[in-house]
Amino acid sequence: IDLTLDYWTINYKNRIEVESAQVILNNNPNGASITRNQFGELIAVSTSYFNEERTEVEGLDIALNIFKSTQYGDFSYSIKATELSEFLTPEDTDGDERSIMVNRVGKFNYDANTHSLPKLRLNSFLSWTINNLTFGINSRYLDGYSNERSIPSSATSLGYTNQIKSFLVHDFSITKSFQLR
């Protein structure tokens, strides 16, 4: 049995980040970076890179590995998880020369130059090897997150919400080992 627990923190200064096309559209839907056809339909958004003044990230990694060899074959199980507790990025406030740090964890982040950041990601792997056969089950869990963008009443009347639900995926596999001559 092998168990590891790692707390980590990363503080970036002037991290190179790519602009989000959605943020550019939100800030100025008809700006110079936006290309539209003669009907006003969106064709392209030109993005570039910039230095984000700072980014602060904090989390916890957990891993458990178990291996057991028996007369019925070899069994192995592992589980690996990452909990993201902070992903702080600057957000400029109107008229303020200083930016405030906003925690992006658990959010869709349509308004930031980053992506959706679920709080928890978990992967587990179970395998049984006997003779030249390996049977495996892999499972992946991804935490849900919220979208803080408002949703029109026409969408909410159809049951849509601002929550992206968590999901769990299972993969099953069978592998046969053989030697080529």
Segments and roles (model prediction):
Residues 4-76:
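Outer membrane beta-barrel strand-and-loop segments of large Gram-negative receptors
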Residues 15-22, 88-98, 146-156:
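Outer-membrane beta-barrel translocator domains and adjoining extracellular loop/strand segments
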Residues 11, 85-87, 143-145:
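Feature marks short, surface-exposed loop/turn motifs that line or immediately flank catalytic pockets
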Residues 32, 40-50, 99-112, 116-118, ...:
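Extracytoplasmic loops and strand-loop junctions of Gram-negative outer membrane beta-barrel proteins
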Residues 64, 84-88, 93-110, 162-163:
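Short, solvent-exposed micro-motifs at the edges of structured domains
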Residues 33-39, 81, 94-98, 138-141:
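A glycine-rich, aromatic-flanked flexible loop/lid motif
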Residues 60, 65, 73-82, 111-181:
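Conserved C-terminal beta-signal and adjacent last beta-strands/turns
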